Amino acid sequence: MEKNCGSGQSKLKALRMHMYFEVDFQEQAQHYQAVLHSRGVTVDLQPIEKLNARFLRLNPDLALCVDENGLWLSANGMKMQPDWKAEIPRLKRASLKSEMIARACQLGEKPVLVDATAGLGHDSLLMAYLGAQIQLVERHPILFTLLEDSKAQAQHDPFLSQFMDRIQLIFADSASYLQQLDQEEKTVDVVYLDPMFPQRDQNQQAIKKQAQVKKQMQLLHLLLPEDGEMDLGDHLLELAKKVAKRVIVKRPRHAIFLANQEPAHQWQGDACRFDAYFQ
């Protein structure tokens, strides 16, 4: 079940996007247009003859497109969607023992977990597969709709459908959602934070990493610029600590601590680490 907390777009400027589609997919495009309109996004439908790599190269501006695989974000000759089905090989290799994130979040105890920095949902997908009950919170209407579409497709996949009921999508601002939990005196087992944009001036290692981000993340950075719709997550740490016994923060291995707060415990990997804060 998806939940709308009414605050998803409260801090976002008005959005307007082109949506490209071949005529065979007009009905689907109109559906996405209506959904996005209900979330404050004006979508201009643009039927085209052929949605292919050449068209994307000739139309480099940030836009949406629709084909047989659903809704995509496109720019600079590339297109992106969360594509949860592509994560299946990774999931099949994963276990509670092999995954550092499983140890950090104590997934063996099947926790109720709020992922307050959704991104493409890949970490939440893994955590749900390993047993967690996930509340996946995203405030950007376009990214939320992409996640919603990926979940809808996953529900028709024989493998992914087995645990889709463990992922609840919540259209809300994460800070507002955590504040609401606190005001209602509700708690969860874990809050998971994976801020997408470490502070560049204090984290030169992260700068080098960001130069190598894969195509999905390049497009996500265009949709969620650091000085616009995407924040750095620092303010979420204190809010998270009020509602969870355990807060786990994923960071590049050499990044500074989130909000400059030293964690109680760390799990170190080759490329990233998990910082733990306990209540």
From Swiss-Prot:
Localization terms from the record: Cytoplasm
Alphabetized UniProt keyword annotations: Cytoplasm, Methyltransferase, rRNA processing, S-adenosyl-L-methionine, Transferase
CDD domains, alphabetized: AdoMet_MTases
EC number in record: 2.1.1.242
Catalytic activity of the protein: guanosine(1516) in 16S rRNA + S-adenosyl-L-methionine = N(2)-methylguanosine(1516) in 16S rRNA + S-adenosyl-L-homocysteine + H(+)
Gene Ontology CC entries for this record: cytoplasm
Listed GO MF terms: rRNA (guanine-N2-)-methyltransferase activity
Residues annotated for S-adenosyl-L-methionine binding in this entry: 138-139, 194
InterPro entries: 16SrRNA_methylTrfase_J, SAM-dependent_MTases_sf
Primary enzyme class: transferase
Reported function: Specifically methylates the guanosine in position 1516 of 16S rRNA.
PANTHER family: RIBOSOMAL RNA SMALL SUBUNIT METHYLTRANSFERASE J (PTHR36112:SF1)
Entry similarity comment: Belongs to the methyltransferase superfamily. RsmJ family.
Protein name as annotated: Ribosomal RNA small subunit methyltransferase J
Source organism: Acinetobacter baumannii (strain AYE)
